[in-house]
Amino acid sequence: AGDGAGSALQGGFVCYSKDAKVRMLGLPSETLQTRLGAVTETVARLMAEGARDRSGAAIAIAVTGVLGPSCDEDGNPVGLVDIACAV
C-alpha cells in the first residue's frame, strides 16, 4: 500500500466458507442453499452490499469463485468467478 492508502481502504473480509458469508456479511443462508451454491452473481452482489454495510465504507467489492483443484461442492467448475461492486 502506498502513502495515504488508509484514507482509501476501510478494511476487508475473507469469507471463504458459506457459513462465513452468512455470519460476517449477513447473507441469507437460503441464498447459498440454491442449486448453484455460493458462486453466483446474486451472491457476489449480496457479499458486496454486506461488506459495504458492515464496514461503513462508501464502496465495496466482492469476489466469489471456485479456486480448485476440482469443482466445488455445488458442481461449479474451477475458474468460475463472479465479481460485484456496491456503491
Name each model-derived stretch.
Residues 1-87:
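Short alpha-helical segments enriched in small residues
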